[in-house]
Amino acid sequence: MSDTTTAENANEPRLITETGLDRRVADIIEPVLVDLGFRLVRVRMSGQNGLTLQVMTERNDGTMTVEDCEEVSKAISPVLDVEDPIDKAYHLEVSSPGIDRPMVRRSDFIRWQGHLLKCETSVLVEGRKRFRGKIVSVDEDGFRLERDQPAYGEEAGVTIPFTALSEARLILTDELIRDALTADKKAKAARAANENFEEEDRDIE
């Protein structure tokens, strides 16, 4: 897994975005999230258990706690009430991307290089639209996937342009769980150390 810095990720645009009502909601809440130090991952309306607005987000360092979810929920709820993009009663659900997360930014592919991914494209890439395999390299325009189950006669390696990507998600494995927990622990420790430094700096002033 490759590391990416918080500064590089703070204003990085998403490769995969919403359409329709989901897009309208995303446009409303994303500036609020950015001001709080979070990045929007995905917005999705769901009809399960009534109408549910699912907002998936994370801090710029990739972490997300229960307290963070509560903070985001309290911040975006009044904004949604004022803008009123949804004309029906709904339940707001704020969550982290999870370990088997959606991949929506180029930095996601860099960070999780070496792990298994499943994805779909909006156009045919080497004769198909669905792929599964390990991320082996990433450049400005796309990523290279080493398929773990290539069909007979197919090359294992395939290059997928970011512009063709319609959906992508990590596949849960023991290795992914281990690396994700390690990365989360390191990021939270770094954030705590930075907060302590800022407090000490204020005390000196």
From Swiss-Prot:
Protein name from the UniProt record: Ribosome maturation factor RimP
Family annotation (Gene3D superfamilies): Ribosome maturation factor RimP, C-terminal domain, RimP-like superfamily, N-terminal
Keyword list, A-Z: Cytoplasm, Ribosome biogenesis
HAMAP family given in the database record: RimP (MF_01077)
Tagged with keyword Membrane: no
UniProt cross-references to InterPro entries, sorted A to Z: Ribosome_maturation_RimP, RimP_C, RimP_C_sf, RimP_N, RimP_N_sf
Function: Required for maturation of 30S ribosomal subunits.
Biological process annotations from GO: ribosomal small subunit assembly; translation
Family affiliation: Belongs to the RimP family.
Chief localization: cytoplasm
Keyword Cytoplasm applies: yes
Location of the protein in the cell: Cytoplasm
GO cellular component: cytosol
Organism taxonomic ancestry: Bacteria, Pseudomonadati, Pseudomonadota, Alphaproteobacteria, Hyphomicrobiales
NCBIfam families found in the cross-reference section: PRK00092.2-5
PANTHER family recorded: RIBOSOME MATURATION FACTOR RIMP (PTHR33867:SF1)
Any Pfam family matching the protein: DUF150_C
